[in-house]
């Protein structure tokens, strides 16, 4: 997996500093942040390096069939933000929502907006 560009790393490091945490890249060049309310935010470079994948994983209070159905219904074009949302479940049962950002347009505002969008979508599950 390719590494982030210098600009993208600077955005992620600034984001982390604003949140009061240190940004440390994993071996696969991804970054992960754990938030008490929002869940686990992961920022991952795409295989082709053209996009940045932003994921938010949250362990649901209940993981029954109706909650899972609501999770998967969120997949597709989000009307509010006009971004394509991906939905899935992690091996630990966490609900995962993700979206792609164009690397060349990646900045603090787009990362903040991605976190807000994903958090609001998670909240809508119930």
Where would I find each of the regions flagged by the language model?
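Charge-rich, low-complexity N-terminal segments
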Residues: 1-40, 80-84, 90
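Short, internal acidic amphipathic alpha-helical interface segments
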Residues: 55-94
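A short acidic-to-branched-hydrophobic micro-motif
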Residues: 41-61
């Amino acid at each position: 997996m390719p590494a982030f560009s210098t600009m993208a790393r600077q955005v992620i490091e600034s984001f982390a500093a604003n949140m009061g945490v240190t940004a440390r890249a994993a071996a696969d060049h991804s970054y992960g942040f754990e938030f008490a309310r929002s869940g686990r935010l992961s920022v991952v470079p795409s295989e082709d390096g053209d996009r940045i994948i932003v994921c938010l994983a949250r362990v649901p209070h209940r993981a029954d069939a109706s909650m899972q159905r609501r999770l998967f219904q969120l997949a597709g074009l989000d009307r509010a933000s006009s971004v394509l949302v991906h939905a899935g479940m992690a091996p630990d049962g966490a609900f995962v929502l993700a979206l792609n950002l164009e690397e060349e347009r990646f900045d603090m505002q787009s990362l903040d907006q991605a976190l807000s969008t994903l958090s609001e979508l998670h909240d809508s599950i119930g």
